[in-house]
Amino acid sequence: MATETFLYTSESVNEGHPDKLCDQISDAVLDACLEQDPDSKVACETCTKTNMVMVFGEITTKANVDYEKIVRNTCRNIGFVSDDVGLDADNCKVLVNIEQQSPDIAQGVHGHLTKRPEEIGAGDQGHMFGYATDETPELMPLTHVLATKLGAKLTEVRKNGTCPWLRPDGKTQVTIEYFNDKGAMVPIRVHTVLISTQHDETVTNDEIAADLKQHVIKPVIPEKYLDEKTIFHLNPSGRFVIGGPHGDAGLTGRKIIIDTYGGWGAHGGGAFSGKDPTKVDRSGAYIVRQAAKSIVANGLARRCIVQVSYAIGVPEPLSVFVDSYGTGKIPDKEILNIVKETFDFRPGMISINLDLKRGGNNRFLKTAAYGHFGRDDADFTWEVVKPLKGGKLATA
């Protein structure tokens, strides 16, 4: 019987991409603030262009933070150690323009730190989405998982010397042929793999293609998804020597789909990096990922999306929504009731239940490259599945 299939694509960028560099600097600042003062209020933006990084925003903290040192260390650790590769961590200009959080916002959200956790209001209005699908062990879309892992592997083989010609900047993209199984997504095969990576002057395009196939694609993409029809575009522009902030300007919060679900589900538009957990752009998105993942892991649906929305200064969410795309074992209305009974969507309680005030150990820096979801790391507390009533993980 002929089955109707369709193509779907997700992209990723690795840690040397200028936008991702900015995300990582913003989250490194957040980590430093929270490590010394868990009640820090942080809204840290970063931008970069040739030979310059600027950190700006609103931060209220008791922490003693050396912003310039954080910027230089983060750039250096990524591999930006000379003008040749796109930025020189030790010699670039670092500009800092940080002010305190607006007292108007402070009184409305946390009462200048006088409110109890359950009273803390959302730091802003907005709506956030969580998504999960049973197509991978991570309960994430395979297009996104493979694009992200290719980017991480590019960085790994650059840093361990396997491919010494690699430079920090790079992008990946994966197209997969899917079958729609009554609302659930079933990957059939990888249709197209695209990698564009920064490189030095010494390497030929043929060498680039051979190394990428052998050391990046082969270890990442399971053989069962590749066939003789799979298309490979490996550095299709023909030259990518100039990269990093020298090639393109970078800005925090410009890779929000890469940070989440690769175009699947939905996105409320709010970025994550550089924001403390009173910012529901981040904490709200984390709790609805935990809810969506728990729904699928408990077998209540094969695929689902969860939305939550907030008003500034108000603790209780304005709305919670669940859609199982027709894959639910029980009606969506019942799943929604179980979600509302199980998860506390008030921002102050999200912070406690997901331990989001804990910085240090590169806790949030780790989230700022290669995705915030589907990661196997104890610091990613929102990836912990909760047993749900009527689900297969619920105790009798």
From Swiss-Prot:
Q: Which residues bind ATP?
A: 17, 169-171, 237-240, 248, 254-255, 271, 275, 279
Q: Name the positions where Mg(2+) binds.
A: 11
**Which parts of the sequence bind K(+)?**
45
Under the heading PROSITE patterns, the entry gives: ADOMET_SYNTHASE_1 (PS00376), ADOMET_SYNTHASE_2 (PS00377)
Which keywords does UniProt give here?
A: ATP-binding, Cobalt, Cytoplasm, Magnesium, Metal-binding, Nucleotide-binding, One-carbon metabolism, Potassium, Transferase
Q: Which cysteines are joined by disulfide bonds?
A: none
Q: Name one Pfam family in it.
A: S-AdoMet_synt_C
State where the protein is found.
Answer: Cytoplasm
Instruction: Give the catalytic activity.
Output: L-methionine + ATP + H2O = S-adenosyl-L-methionine + phosphate + diphosphate
- Binding locations of L-methionine: 58, 101, 248, 279
Cofactor note (record): Binds 2 divalent ions per subunit. The metal ions interact primarily with the substrate. Can utilize magnesium, manganese or cobalt (in vitro). Binds 1 potassium ion per subunit. The potassium ion interacts primarily with the substrate.
Q: What class of enzyme is it?
A: transferase
Which cofactor(s) does the record list? Mn(2+); Mg(2+); Co(2+); K(+)
The record's Gene Ontology cellular component field reads: cytoplasm
Give the pathway.
Amino-acid biosynthesis; S-adenosyl-L-methionine biosynthesis; S-adenosyl-L-methionine from L-methionine: step 1/1
Q: GO:BP terms for this protein?
A: one-carbon metabolic process; S-adenosylmethionine biosynthetic process
Which molecular function terms from Gene Ontology are attached?
A: ATP binding; metal ion binding; methionine adenosyltransferase activity
Q: What is its EC number?
A: 2.5.1.6
Under PANTHER family, the record lists: S-ADENOSYLMETHIONINE SYNTHETASE
Q: Which family does it belong to?
A: Belongs to the AdoMet synthase family.
Relate the assembly described in the record. Answer: Homotetramer.
Primary role = Catalyzes the formation of S-adenosylmethionine from methionine and ATP. The reaction comprises two steps that are both catalyzed by the same enzyme: formation of S-adenosylmethionine (AdoMet) and triphosphate, and subsequent hydrolysis of the triphosphate.
What NCBIfam families does the entry give? metK
Name this protein carries in UniProt: S-adenosylmethionine synthase
Q: Which organism is it from?
A: Medicago sativa subsp. falcata (Sickle medic)
Record gene name: SAMS
